[in-house]
Amino acid sequence: MTALSIRKRLALEVARKIRNNRKEMHPLKQLFWECTQRCNLHCKHCGSDCKRTSEVKDMPAADFLRVIDSITPHVDPNEVNIIITGGEPLMRNDLEEVGLALYRRGYPWGLVSNGLYLTADCLQGLMAAGLHTITISLDGFAGEHNWLRGHPDSYDRAMDAIKRLVHEPELTW
């Protein structure tokens, strides 16, 4: 075995420091989980294969939480915002349980939704499970939004969801 030249040793040391610096300078701040490929709309601008029924099964909540548990020793959970997306995440029937499990682990969590399934009862359940953030997609005025989303009531239902959210002081954005 030959000894490494000083030049190669310096290059390896510099590469190691750069790699370690990246971990320190770019800590995990947001983690997005596409929890389903099912969606209750058929948006013209969407590039995903999401549809009302999907051949792709949803990732089991237990598998996702195992991933979170493997990350937890390496981060401050309070500093990592977990965003649940889809498809339409509210098509899952275990979202409150997942949210509560994240909340108990110290993670702030939120979701991105089209708002169609965000009833008052649904919102209260999510809030009780520690919901921290939520985004409702809105693509313009009623005519444009409904056309883009392929649903005649999607604008009104998204607006109803937004009106509910305005009254939740615990939500940050």
Model-derived features: positions:
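Residues within alpha-helical segments
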Residues: 36, 146, 159-162
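Conserved radical SAM core fold
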Residues: 89-90, 115-120, 137-152
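Conserved strand-turn element in the central/C-terminal portion of the radical SAM core barrel
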Residues: 162-173
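Alpha-helix N-cap and loop-to-helix initiation/capping positions
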Residues: 56-59, 63, 149-157
